[in-house]
Amino acid sequence: RPTRERDLEMLKKSAYAMLKNTGYEEISLSSLSSSDYSQLGELVNFLIDEFGSKGINISLPSLRIDAFSLDVMSKVQDIRKSSLTFAPEAGSQRLRDVINKGLTEEVILDGAGQAFEGGWNRVKLYFMLGQPTETEEDMKGIAWLAEKISERYYEVPKEQRNGKCQIVVSTSFFVPKPFTPFQWAQMCTKEEFLHRAYVVNHEIKEQKNKKSIKYNWHEADVTVLEGILARGDRKVAKAIRSAYEKGCLFDSW
């Protein structure tokens, strides 16, 4: 896969412009894998020097755990901490291999452990339900992985912990997209999506550290609509226009 990166100076100017024109108090470094950006360290140092004293939060989502940088994490921990976002995508190693995620449970737990040791206590985990070949074991694996991550937090010496552990598990639903390896895969129905979310939710409630784990899932109705828009042909344009004429404007879909 060819690497394309934003120019460092352009990112600096964009940060200035966004804070000046929006009034926001957070800068989020977002990409498919923020930690792979070759100038991430220099960019983070710049943001801290320029905006840290002003209480601007620096958020680091989209971190690929196997490329997680403890050095970068330690640089931003003294500013207003936000949660760290990891995307295991699937609860089992088998399914991660199917979707070519390339992460092992050991690497995931090690990355989370580094985050906890670096002063974080809030972690967001993103998964996807309804992926090809998914079994109930894979669904329950999401809860088991969240539990193992929470256990990793409590392995950190008490004096080094930063309050109560907070793990937010979020699941979206799989939508087969054109020109992707799974473009012809079957998509779940609304009822199937909700059943899978129920399995995860029920299993989380069975875990020892369930109070440390919060679970959110995507709207099944919106996912089904997304699937129609993704797989539909030009005829779908008529439905979109009809929805607009009936008052749909800036709707989530």
Question: Where does each model-flagged region fall?
Answer:
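Canonical Radical SAM [4Fe-4S] cluster-binding loop centered on the CxxxCxxC motif
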Residues: 1-9
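Short, conserved loop/turn and helix-capping segments at secondary-structure boundaries
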Residues: 5, 102-105, 187-194
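Short helix/loop capping segments that flank catalytic or ligand/cofactor-binding pockets
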Residues: 1, 38, 94-95, 179-180, ...
